[in-house]
């Protein structure tokens, strides 16, 4: 098992970042996300928005990794559940792969909150737990996947900035 974590600060208020995060896919920074389907969306009694989405992704696994895993499949599906609490100003998003679960599990958690010292900024904390199952080079593959997650996180931050920039230019 490998744990990866990160923190990023956006120079935008929470509301702006959340609106962009909800519209993050598709984006030109991370073309590996091929599609997003909303399976369920509801507002609970406390006014929190719950969303359940299915993401179709193309894991660009190197041929060596595919050989070690014993699969040629690179199209994967991810289940994503998010809760947006506009009163507490908190968005929590949890995702897990639902494809190749016999070989690997990736559980990711993202939390967006206003910066504690500057409400014009937003803090994103991310954590991913990666587990490769029953493979002799499992820890090596977990480290490779953690590096990929780190790279994709940076693309995600850039995508949110891109969406905000393009949303603001569309309004002006």
UniProtKB/Swiss-Prot annotation:
GO biological process, one term: phospholipid transport
Site (Important for interaction with TRIAP1) location in chain: 36, 49
Pfam families to which the protein is assigned, alphabetical: PRELI
Superkingdom of origin organism: Eukaryota
Principal location class: mitochondrion
Any one Gene Ontology cellular component term annotated for this protein: mitochondrion
Gene Ontology MF term list: phosphatidic acid transfer activity
Localization in the cell: Mitochondrion
Disulfide bond annotation, renumbered to this chain: none
UniProt keyword annotations, A-Z: Lipid transport, Mitochondrion, Transport
Coiled coil: none
Domain PRELI/MSF1: 1-172
Family in the record: Belongs to the slowmo family.
The protein's assembly and partners: Interacts with TRIAP1.
Function: In vitro, the TRIAP1:PRELID3A complex mediates the transfer of phosphatidic acid (PA) between liposomes and probably functions as a PA transporter across the mitochondrion intermembrane space. Phosphatidic acid import is required for cardiolipin (CL) synthesis in the mitochondrial inner membrane.
Protein name: PRELI domain containing protein 3A
Organism listed in the record: Homo sapiens (Human)
